[in-house]
Amino acid sequence: MVTVAIADTDPGRRTRLEQSLQSEEGIKVLTNVMPNGNKISSNRRSKPRTNITAIEDVITRIGRLKPRILFVDLDQFINGDFALLEALHRKCPETLVVLLTDKSAKDEQIIQALANGARGCLNREAASLYFLKAVRVVDQGEIWVTRKMLGKIMDKVLH
């Protein structure tokens, strides 16, 4: 059973994706991961703590939920700050992050996110079939990127 969580800033889009993945055999969707704004959250209330950063809070919540695959909206990484992604990769290594992007996402931003631990990227408006394929592929240890993006990654590696 592959556990999946979706951290998308658009609740309607997130709900549609959750519903489409829930109907798939072998996938358990962890819902209500992100109920308010741009914060990743679980439906369980944490004890209030002082001096905790938003990133630490997210890491604690994801660590408690333990999704195998976490779809994260690229918009969460404002101004190229990938501290959340780096912390997820370091402290929750069992959780594999796939970025949700749109046409406005810059290739360099995606490559930076991949370099900081993301295991793939997918247009957030893609057909649900592609989300299912991404879950299966990333769960098996592979990456999920377009061939065009793979070419750009190879150019970076070789030059």
Task: Give residue ranges: language-model regions.
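Conserved phosphotransfer microenvironments
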Residues: K39-I59, L65-L88
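Conserved phosphotransfer cores of two-component systems
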Residues: G63-L65, L88-E94, N116
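Two-component signal transduction core modules
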Residues: L70, V97, C121-L122
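Alpha4-beta5-alpha5 switch/output surface of CheY-like receiver
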Residues: G80, K106-Q109
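A short, hydrophobic beta-strand element within the central beta-sheet of small alpha/beta folds
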Residues: E94-A105
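Short, flexible helix-to-coil linker/hinge segments that flank and couple to helix-turn-helix
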Residues: Q109-A115, G120-H159
